[in-house]
């Protein structure tokens, strides 16, 4: 399908004919560091990532990229990104095509889009998230994964970190008996935006509306369901 996007801007913005004004790195770093919330239970979570609800259209990839781009002060629109990625109604995006389009927009804004092959180590996750930089995560959003994430997110609220860590360790041991997702099974992209070092968990957010702003899963489970690629927009 074709989409029409109408943008109403101030005269001085329109006069620039779409050229972006780069937000200074130092200013953006301070803003992002201020977005990092450190909780008493050891959770470290990035707040204020814009929510974009993909709705029933299956636009998880363009919606998720829009969220991260807007968080990095880069103008973005889910529908325009969907066209760039040849996204059809109901989903299905040519990732490489979309990434190339995003790279251009990110570069114009003075940022860099880096591809991370494989799932990052916990230390790598910490490095980005502590600085307030979220990670786009390619993964398999299976029924088992979502049921587990929903249950854990609810249960962990009433548990002490040390006790909860033992529960997570037992759960991680059962991964050996869990088959790996098939290559094209339930492919999805969401955003990793938090971690807990004591419990070795990660927080992630989906482009499905406010109810999916923050969910939790163990880092080992996240690696198990990873589709092998992540992306980070850096300064």
For each predicted feature, which ranges?
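Predominantly the structural core of cysteine protease catalytic domains
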Residues: 91-198, 202, 234
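Noncatalytic regulatory segments and standalone regulatory/sensor domains
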Residues: 5-33, 156, 162-235
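Generic hydrophobic, helix-prone segments enriched in Leu/Val/Ile
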Residues: 2, 81, 125-129, 222
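A generic "cationic amphipathic patch" detector
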Residues: 73, 81, 115, 150, ...
